[in-house]
Amino acid sequence: MASKRLMLDVEEEDDESGACGQENFDPHDADMEYQAKRRKSAVQETPLQWMLKRHIPASTTVLSPITELSQNMNGARLDGTPKSTQRIPANRTLNNFNSLSSRTLGSFSSSCSSYESGNSLDDEYMDMFEMESAENHNLELPDDLEVLLSGQLKSESNLEEMSNKKGSLRRCLSMYPSEQPEEAVQEPDQETNMPMKKMQRKTLSMNDAEIMRALGDEPELIGDLSKPCTLPCLATGIRHRDLKTISSDTLARLIQGEFDEQLGSQGGYEIIDCRYPYEFLGGHIRGAKNLYTRGQIQEAFPTLTSNQENRRIYVFHCEFSSERGPKLLRYLRSNDRSQHTHNYPALDYPELYILHNGYKEFFGLYSQLCQPSQYVPMLAPAHNDEFRYFRAKTKSWQCGEGGDSGIGGGGSRGLRKSRSRLLYAE
């Protein structure tokens, strides 16, 4: 009730002042008074009050600045004079101001909540208005319709001006590609005083097949690579390519003395029969020695203290030269290599051979060179007990060193396993 009385008192005072003003009305004084009040209200008006004015319901006559400006511009085009220069009666101005202030005070509480949204909308409206004004300022519309249809839609000068201006962070595709070539992106020069890093180069690693292929290109050499082989070796149809293999014909020629000149007066050969004793006693090559365990190989081939310049040839074989003979030959070569680890490729026994297809083939071709001239197979039924005994004896090396030192059995020098069979290659 108190607020209503206050508003009625204010309206009565305004009516009285308006009545007094009508008696002594002077158009020039009213205009000056209106301009002064307008400047004063613009100075004292806060952004909050201005926003509250914008949010007054549509029934009032107060409009937003953009709408008012557009109406003024339209009115200026229609009437010929802008509305800002037209004089407004003082009474209507004062009445509008009073009613506006009363309505503003009444809607203050409801308008505070929408301040933030109005502020953001106002910023967008102002940006759009500035863009429209800039486009209208630069746009020159032709008067003739024919020129409008045949001319360019956009002038190049406007495009250049817009490109020179700093745009927003968003990128857009230009429909007018520039003729200037794009500058290549150059990396910054590195400092010349930087220390040089050492490059680690990978060493060439050759497998066994490559090494054997390389050795195959060279002439047949003995184990220490110092001399060519005395006996001709087989190149094809052999089982053990890492071992020098000779045929039964070559061994027969060696026994018959055809290679004595190459061996020299103090040289010689020796045949190692790796079969079991009952096989050896049943028939063997003339002059052969029976060695079937690794311990016997170690005793028969000790380490030499001095270099032997005389050539000595050793031919290994068993019944078929498939297992026992090649194993003992490789064992001898392995021990020999281990004794000369720091003096490669020196060897005490460099010239070792394996007989192709063993005693069985040699006996079938040259039985006259065998004594006694007989052939007892390993699996002969009459020697089953002996076979089991010697077989177990030669396999005892797999269970450890000690005892009898059969194939692989213990001895003064243990067998070191090699990752490559080249260790035994001659």
UniProtKB/Swiss-Prot annotation:
**Pfam families per UniProt:** Rhodanese
Write out the catalysed reaction.
O-phospho-L-tyrosyl-[protein] + H2O = L-tyrosyl-[protein] + phosphate
Which is an annotated GO molecular function term of this record?
A: protein tyrosine phosphatase activity
Tell me which CDD domains the record gives: Cdc25 (cd01530)
Which residues participate directly in catalysis?
318
Q: Which residues form the Rhodanese domain?
A: 265-371
Q: Which InterPro entries match?
A: MPI_Phosphatase (IPR000751), Rhodanese-like_dom (IPR001763), Rhodanese-like_dom_sf (IPR036873)
- The reply on keyword Endoplasmic reticulum is no
Which tissues does the record link to its expression?
Expressed in developing male and female germ cells.
- Kindly state which keywords UniProt assigns to this record, in alphabetical order: Cell cycle, Cell division, Hydrolase, Meiosis, Protein phosphatase
**What does this gene product do?**
Required during meiosis. Regulates the transition from the extended G2 phase to the onset of the first meiotic division.
Give the record's family classification.
Belongs to the MPI phosphatase family.
**Mind telling me what this protein is named?**
Cdc25-like protein phosphatase twine
From which organism does this entry originate?
A: Drosophila melanogaster (Fruit fly)
User: In the UniProt record, what gene is named as encoding this protein?
Assistant: twe
